[in-house]
């Protein structure tokens, strides 16, 4: 049995895959989870974790020296942790706090694996690539990796929660009621909460629909619900839940942000989606994530910068009037997730970590 340190922090996009990797490894190895305060809120209370906080400094030139100082302190702290614990392997799923941990792991000559689910490599991972043994990716053609490091890429099917492999939304049924999911990922989407309600109400005058919508924190669900009920729209409104799609997967179409985990889950469940990438995502990675699926003819894209009132209404009406395109996208999603199982993925991950 080896001791594996999983380093993760920041958003759910980093932490949730780390938890899924934790589940894959915990039966064979002694697994320790390191995260920061922000990331800890996504981790169940019953999962043991170590808080490793790193002060994040704004990306401003005049803060550069202060940033270096804080990272140096964090690196020293990481060295102390490695000197007090016998870690064999480090797996980093990202987050600002992972930078000093991976550098300390290199100093102590540990095996290092990075995880990059996006279609363009993140800045920290790009910097750390020279120190790592391998990098797990969902896309072998990931953008931004130097050709000298291409041999470090290990392409894996998405690392999802185990419950996802039980549920599938395989068949198209020409129901009279269209079930729509609006989801914004772990950080929710203020844009969706502010802009989609009137679109949905207008849409309900043309098609019989049932709505399930994630709201941003701070919104009053009851007040929001009243407007839908006035228009006879059956609805289920909720705030972020980590395993929501494990319990609710029977949807005809989704409107979603384009975080890698959100798109991977919708793909695995065979739910065609309209992607509205978050325009402020670092290096515009959400747009690249969406384009990957669009190139595979699995989704539609609406960019927020070009968004006008009525766009969602028009797009869904267009989709409902062109069932052949919808069915094509659903079938393409099905092909992407065929023959994928928790057990096979588990064997692959463990075999790579156990290689000498």
Tell what function each PLM region has.
Residues 4-9, 31-70, 156, 184, ...:
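Conserved nucleotide-sugar phosphate-binding/catalytic loop shared by glycosyltransferases and other
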Residues 30, 38, 108-168, 295:
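Active-site-proximal region of nucleotide-activated glycan assembly enzymes
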Residues 34, 39-47, 165-169, 173-254, ...:
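Donor-nucleotide binding loops and adjacent catalytic segments primarily
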Residues 60-89, 103, 107:
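An amphipathic, basic-hydrophobic alpha-helix
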Residues 87-89, 249-264, 271-272:
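Acidic donor-binding loop of glycosyltransferase active sites
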Residues 300, 306-337, 355:
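Conserved donor-nucleotide binding/catalytic region of nucleotide-linked donor-dependent transferases
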Residues 338-356:
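C-terminal alpha-helical cap of glycosyltransferases
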